[in-house]
Structures are given as C-alpha cells and as structure tokens.
Amino acid sequence: SFKLPNLFRRLFGEGAMNSAFIPVISGIKSKFGKNKSDEFFSLIFSSLLIFLLILLIIAEIFMPFIVKLIAPGFTDDSNKFILTVDLSRLTFPFVFFICLTSLAGAYLNTLGRFAAMALTPIILNLTIIFCLLIFLRTNDKVIVSNYLSLSISVAGFIQLSWIIFSLKRSSINLKFLSFQNPAFKNRKKEIKNFLILLAPAIIGNGAYQINLLIDMILASTLPDGSISYLYFADRVNQLPLGVLGIAISTALLPILSQHVKERNVIEANASISESIKFGIYFSVPALVGIFLLSNQIISFLFLRGEFSLEDTKLTSFALTALCFGLPAFILIKILVVPFFANEDTKTPIKVSVFSMLLNLILNLILIKEFLHVGLAIATSVSAWVNALILF
C-alpha cells in the first residue's frame, strides 16, 4: 500500500523537483532578485497544490483500478486485493503532502538551506515508529495495518508543516495565488520552462524507481512474498543510495546551476569531477560490504516474528543482485545533474527510456529462471547501461 506514495516521494522528493525547479528559479533570482523568486515559488506552489488536490480525489475514487494496474497478481485473492485498496486509500494523501514539501525543499536548497529538507525523512520514520509502539501489543493485524497506513499520511502533513515553518524562518514570503493573479501572465515563460523540465526530470531521475515499479508489477504474478523480498532488499539498498547519491546531487545542482548562469565552465567541470570521484570512492566499498554480508544484514534487520529463515535467504539473494547496481544508481543521480543545470532535458530522458525498455526485456527473460532475483538482476544491469551512456 505504501509502494505507490513512496514512488511519488522518490520521484519528486529525491530529484525531479530539484532538477526542474532549481535551474529556473536560480535564473529568476540572479536576474530579478529574491522578491521575484519568492513570487515565482508561490505561483508554482499554488498551481501544484490545486493539481495535487484534484489528483488525490481522482486516485481515491479509482483506487481499485490503480491497484489492479500496479499489482495485477492480487486480483486472484479478493481479500488481499480489498485490503490493499483500503490501505492504499489511507496512504495516498501522503503524495499530496510530499510533493508540496519537495517543492518547498527545492527552493530552500536553492538558497543554500539544506538542513530543513534533510530532516523530513526523520519525521516520517519517527511517526511510523511511534505508531508501531502504540499498537505493539495489538493482535489484530488489520487494525495495525490501517493505523500504520494512516500514520504515513499524518507524517506527510507534519513534514509539510515543518517545511512551511522553515520557509517562514528563512524569510520566504509564501502566498496562495489564484490563476487570475497578474503574476501568472508575467511569469508565463518561466512557468513553461519549469513544466518542460519537470516531466523529463521525473523520467531522467526516476528510471531506477520506475524500473522497480515494473519489477513489483511482475513480482505480483510470482509466489507469495516475492514483492516483499524485493521491497526489503530495496530498502537496504536505499541507505547508501540516499546517503550518497541523493545527498551529492541535491548539493551539486544549486552550485552547478549558479556556475552555468555565470558561465563559469572551469568551476562547473571541477564540481562534477569531484562529485563523481566522491560517489565512486564510497559506493564501491558499500557494494563489497553488502555483497559479503547480505544474509547477515537481512537477518539482523528482519529475522523475527513471521519473517522466516527462508524469507531471509530469498531477500538476501535479491539484495545481492541489487547491490551490484549500487555504484551505477549513485552515478546516475550525479550524472543527470549537469544536463538539468544546462536545461537539457532530451539527453537524460532518451537514456532513461532506453534503460527502462532494456530492464523490461531483461525482466521477461530472467523472471522464468530466477523469479524475483531475475528482476533485481535486470534492474542492476539496466542501471549500469544508463550510467555508462550518460558518462
């Protein structure tokens, strides 16, 4: 149930919003000053709020159809399908909150204030942990699942509240502006540039996440537990990816955008080179560590309750396959930044679409022999192809 809103979080919160928004607003700030950049931020925030509200209403109404699309294998079990629909309806409001939070965080990053957005994942984790502690002794799994799903949306609300508070602390003047406001006409060109960048940024930055979604769809047709094995393996793999890849790209984009606006080619190239070196130096040891200790890591994190030794083994196999793509996943996060800083949307999207098609082909070939592990192998191979072409 958390897979769909979590996909939105990773697509928007971990790259796309930064890639589309920062180059545009950096240009406005450089040319016209902070007051005008605040105004443009308010325009985009107001527009996104209305769009997300409409999306939320539509998604809540048509959630059964959405679940059929992302988990077609669940339709064979009516109880599992109904439960997934109910839980997805509770978690989906998180999408509304996290997309607005990501936009506000991108603006704070432009101003060099990274701490506020960096703390938002902690809010999500603490809210979930708090909910689990409350229902620790509750035996009814359905009740626990419902409240746990609801806690995700509550966490999203707290995250948005925190980031708006951070905006005020940074003296950013956020206003809700209607479409009749003259500012919409005055900034028509910049709004168009942002929208032109956003769709390619989602695909360019989110190839890994979209590939994982495809993996999950195919995994729903495999034996019970296959989706969970991939999900838990991805959660472990996300730790170094989040700490390194996302952190580096988040810090690099505002700096690189500024260098591009100032036409400082030497400094721009130096920033890119240092980021690539840093990513490789830390991702390769992480790969080796996860490969050698995958079973021990999964055992330590998950081997309790209904998570059996067999589950541990099958999850560790998926983690081993995914970890081989770790340096590539991190390099992609870094390598797409120069393209978006230069407002080049075509190259990343072409490479990402090619890698997604390759991933799908490999999935269909490997799933028969290696089941869920074959899906993880396909994701890693396609990531390396993506990174090498971008390089």
Can you annotate each of these PLM segments?
Residues 1-391:
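Membrane-embedded alpha-helical bundles of multi-pass transporters/translocases
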